[in-house]
Amino acid sequence: CNSDIVIRAKVVGKKLVKEGPFGTMVYTVKQMKMYRGFTKMPHVQYIHTEASESLCGLKLEVNKYQYLLTGRVYDGKVYTGLCNFVERWDQLTLSQRKGLNYRYHLGCNCKIKSCYYLPCFVTSKNECLWTDMLSNFGYPGYQSKHYACIR
């Protein structure tokens, strides 16, 4: 819900571009499917990220995997980084894959309430309690792999 673009894509090339003080890695992608962003950019060909992982830049494998990529659009370019949800497609659970097609868009009005210690509870109808923090110190816990907040 917070991303401008959500796509399934295979990285087919990469190039280091000298934009900004540290450089930008530009990945060429073959878009397999778009889940979000039809109006902002109906077809994504390039994904931009910081060249350095220390600046939240992503390192993606070329011609090896398909990825679920999320990001923002600025000045007609798609940007992503370590703070965005990026995962190899084959590492997603069946629930996550189904969520992309059928469920996640129904939860954009939900508020996730993180539970760090017990007891914890929701305080309004549009809240979903996220308890992954109790056992797995956050992502990726069972809830993040198998649940969706829908209101």
From Swiss-Prot:
Disulfide bonds join C1-C108, C115-C120, C128-C149. Residues 53-54 are annotated as: Involved in metalloproteinase-binding. GO terms for molecular function: metalloendopeptidase inhibitor activity; protease binding. GO terms for biological process: negative regulation of membrane protein ectodomain proteolysis; response to cytokine; response to hormone. GO terms for cellular component: extracellular matrix; extracellular space. SMART domains: NTR (SM00206). InterPro entries: Netrin_domain, TIMP, TIMP-like_OB-fold, TIMP_C. It comes from the Eukaryota. Residues 71-151 are annotated as: Mediates interaction with EFEMP1. It is found in: Secreted, Extracellular space, Extracellular matrix. Residues 1-108 form the NTR domain. Keywords: Disulfide bond, Extracellular matrix, Metalloenzyme inhibitor, Metalloprotease inhibitor, Protease inhibitor, Secreted. Its main location: secreted. Complexes with metalloproteinases (such as collagenases) and irreversibly inactivates them by binding to their catalytic zinc cofactor. May form part of a tissue-specific acute response to remodeling stimuli. Belongs to the protease inhibitor I35 (TIMP) family. Interacts with EFEMP1. This is Metalloproteinase inhibitor 3. The gene is TIMP3.
